[in-house]
From Swiss-Prot:
HAMAP family: Ribosomal_uL29. One of its GO terms (cellular component) is cytosolic large ribosomal subunit. It holds the Pfam family Ribosomal_L29. GO terms for molecular function: structural constituent of ribosome. It comes from Synechococcus sp. (strain CC9902). Keywords: Ribonucleoprotein, Ribosomal protein. This is Large ribosomal subunit protein uL29.
Length: 69
């Protein structure tokens, strides 16, 4: 799965960003569970999910800071 550009993430609505953040957190939980039970074959999915989550959280915090100012 390709990583979205930051500009694509910035075009998402707040609700979409929150939904994607929740989904990625669930995915990371599932990946950790699969790794603990030795069912995970593609460990690179951790890195991809963490990077996507970081992008979304960054855009979310930028928006929160801009509305607070």
């Amino acid at each position: 799965m390709a990583r979205p550009n930051t500009s694509e993430v910035r075009n998402l609505s707040d609700a979409d960003i929150n939904e994607k953040i929740d989904g990625l957190r669930r995915e990371l939980f599932q990946l950790r569970f699969e790794q603990a039970t030795r069912q995970l074959a593609n460990t690179h999915r951790f890195k991809e999910a963490r990077i996507k989550l970081a992008q979304l959280l960054t855009v979310q915090s930028e928006r929160q800071r801009s509305t607070a100012s």
